[in-house]
From Swiss-Prot:
Ranges of compositional bias, category Pro residues: 11-22
Role, per record: Precursors of the cornified envelope of the stratum corneum.
Leftover remarks: Belongs to the LCE cluster present on 1q21.
Tissues showing expression: Skin-specific. Expression was readily detected in adult trunk skin, adult arm skin, fetal skin, penal skin, vulva, esophagus and tongue. Not expressed in the cervix, rectum, lung, colon, or placenta.
Pfam families: LCE
Protein name: Late cornified envelope protein 3E
Residue stretches of biased makeup (Gly residues): 76-92
Source organism of the structure: Homo sapiens (Human)
GO annotation (BP), single: keratinization
Gene (name only): LCE3E
Keyword Membrane: no
Length: 92
């Protein structure tokens, strides 16, 4: 009986961190997207190594092309809202 009660108390804890993980992901991605570039442009940020969160499939093509062109200049948002970079901090 002592063992069964111990196992029951061990099961609830692992279920707690699970729901706390999903909400933390979007929260960390929201700030960089708003700070790095406009959310209407596609939402890019350093948090997402892929470049953009919203248009991940379509923007992924442009992100790689403007990566060294717009980000390498040190201007960050020189792409004009057409490309994202994951090396300089996320530019749109």
């Amino acid at each position: 009986m002592s063992c069964q009660q111990n196992q029951k108390q061990c099961q609830p804890p692992p279920k707690c961190p699970s729901p706390k993980c999903p909400p933390k992901n979007p929260v960390q991605c929201l700030p960089p997207a708003s700070s790095g570039c406009a959310p209407s442009s596609g939402g890019c940020g350093p948090s997402s190594e892929g470049g953009c969160f919203l248009n991940h499939h379509r923007r992924h093509h442009r992100c790689r092309r403007q990566r060294s062109n717009s980000c390498d200049r040190g201007s960050g948002q020189q792409g004009g809202g057409s490309g994202c970079c994951h090396g300089s901090g996320g530019c749109c």
